[in-house]
């Protein structure tokens, strides 16, 4: 029985050691920039790895995202042509967004929100949604 326990302990330690080595090799840094809808400056895609575009809001019917300045969002996602490694996310919420809690409390509203998030991801070629 003692040898079985020792064998299991050795196996567990081996797995943990492999996991630690695997994690230590991943030293890629994330450089994230928040970009607002009202700005004019674009971040350098050779420096940043991720851009969070601020903001989109839950609309009054809970069925559609209201994206501030869609034209600017398109300019941001166009940077991915120059820098394919770049990830662009749409930040939903923010200080002035008051409808998110209402949407999250209702299953039907959550489903509509999720579908419209998927639409926005496809339409603007986003890499994800950031819930702010």
Task: Mark where each language-model region is.
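Bacterial Sec-dependent N-terminal signal peptides
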Residues: 1-27
């Amino acid at each position: 029985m003692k040898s079985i326990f020792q064998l299991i302990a050795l196996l567990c330690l081996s797995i943990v050691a492999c996991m630690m080595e695997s994690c230590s090799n991943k030293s890629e840094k994330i450089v994230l920039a928040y970009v607002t809808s009202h700005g004019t400056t674009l971040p350098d895609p050779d420096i940043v790895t991720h851009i969070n575009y601020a903001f989109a809001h839950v609309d009054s019917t809970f069925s559609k995202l209201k994206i501030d300045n869609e034209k600017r969002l398109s300019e941001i996602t166009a940077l991915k042509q120059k820098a394919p490694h770049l990830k662009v996310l749409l930040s939903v919420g923010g200080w002035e967004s008051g409808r998110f809690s209402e949407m999250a409390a209702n299953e039907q509203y959550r489903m509509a929100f999720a579908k419209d998030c998927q639409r926005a991801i496809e339409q603007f070629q986003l890499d994800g949604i950031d819930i702010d």
